Amino acid sequence: MYSVLKQSIRPRLLATHNQFRTMITAQAVLYTQHGEPKDVLFTQSFEIDDDNLAPNEVIVKTLGSPINPSDINQIQGVYPSKPAKTTGFGTAEPAAPCGNEGLFEVIKVGSNVSSLEAGDWVIPSHVNFGTWRTHALGNDDDFIKLPNPAQSKANGKPNGLTINQGATISVNPLTAYLMLTHYVKLTPGKDWFIQNGGTSAVGKYASQIGKLLNFNSISVIRDRPNLDEVVASLKELGATQVITEDQNNSKEFGPTIKEWIKQSGGEAKLALNCVGGKSSTGIARKLNNNGLMLTYGGMSFQPVTIPTSLYIFKNFTSAGFWVTELLKNNKELKTSTLNQIIAWYEEGKLTDAKSIETLYDGTKPLHELYQDGVANSKDGKQLITY
């Protein structure tokens, strides 16, 4: 897989052997050295010859690309998966592209490409594609097709994907779905999963998907002044029960949870941990025998500590979950999971986690827009649209 960035400003005509060919000016956000995004990012311009595509090549323009914590960690050099550095963008020294998630629209395909055509929406099929850019050039197998709104409408679907849904589809919703379905068989209508980080994007997707699959769920959240309002909103999304971290860690509240599970006739078989520390200990204790806890984050920056007794007497299992590793060599699993998420979006059964959208209009350098987004990430997920 390879990629080249570009930005659609205006095709430029070049005379070559008495013929004219068009070049598309392109831009991308790169870095040559790891560090803080505010210090190391820059915008690189270059051109793509769109009149001389190889048979399997595809040119796409960006519709939107979000800023994820993993993107920031890659730039800092602390994320296990990193994009390769290259001089293919026209830089004097090797540079790496930023961004892992993004939604693109096909604008031109090579003569051998039959799976895609102009106007199709696509996302990268591989990790480390580099999505903080205006356009990209790749092979047809570098992309997975998503239905654009017109195609959804033509297929009789009540809803088409939004740019936010398409641009953010490959991390959080897939993480939630795969954790709920890929490791433990939960009996619909009976069994339970418990998760901390209930107000996080993955937590909200897990609550919704759990309800769609008829799984019972307990979401653990931090206490807050508007607790009743937040609890009501999470239950409306699909959480069966919502408790606070204090209740999660309270021995006195334990019998209440056991009674919920008993009344359903099932078991608590799965825990989803993105916090760590005593929160992870609390949700692990709620599981029945042979339970599994998947850790996919560590927002508290505290280690996961599990009592030895859970391993010995309850045959407890603790494992990590990293969607990138699971899907990097399994395009079929990624595609089938995407198809399920897309179907729920089209049917209006799944609500996406909203992003704070900023339009790139060329008034400031592209990398500054992403630097602003990184700085504003504390206010919510940032999505740069084009």
UniProtKB/Swiss-Prot annotation:
Catalysed reaction equations from the record: a 2,3-saturated acyl-[ACP] + NADP(+) = a (2E)-enoyl-[ACP] + NADPH + H(+)
Entry annotation: catalytic residues: 79 (proton donor)
Enzyme class (EC, first level): oxidoreductase
Residues noted as binding NADP(+) in the record, renumbered to the chain: 172, 199-202, 222-224, 296-299, 321-323, 381
InterPro entries: ADH-like_C, ADH-like_N, GroES-like_sf, Mito_Enoyl-ACP_Reductase, NAD(P)-bd_dom_sf, PKS_ER
Main localization (coarse): mitochondrion
Compartment annotation: Mitochondrion
Sample GO molecular function, one term: enoyl-[acyl-carrier-protein] reductase (NADPH) activity
EC numbers, comma separated: 1.3.1.104
Keywords associated with the record: Fatty acid biosynthesis, Fatty acid metabolism, Lipid biosynthesis, Lipid metabolism, Mitochondrion, NADP, Oxidoreductase, Transit peptide
Transit peptide: 1-22
Organism domain of life: Eukaryota
Induction: Up-regulated by growth on oleic acid.
GO BP: fatty acid biosynthetic process; fatty acid metabolic process
Quaternary structure (record): Homodimer and heterodimer with ETR1.
Xref: PANTHER family: ENOYL-[ACYL-CARRIER-PROTEIN] REDUCTASE, MITOCHONDRIAL
Family to which this protein belongs: Belongs to the zinc-containing alcohol dehydrogenase family. Quinone oxidoreductase subfamily.
Role played: Required for respiration and the maintenance of the mitochondrial compartment. Oxidoreductase with a preference for short and medium chain substrates, including trans-2-hexenoyl-CoA (C6), trans-2-decenoyl-CoA (C10), and trans-2-hexadecenoyl-CoA (C16). May play a role in mitochondrial fatty acid synthesis.
Protein name: Enoyl-[acyl-carrier-protein] reductase 2, mitochondrial
Source organism of this protein record: Candida tropicalis (Yeast)
Phylogenetic lineage: Eukaryota, Fungi, Dikarya, Ascomycota, Saccharomycotina
Gene field: ETR2
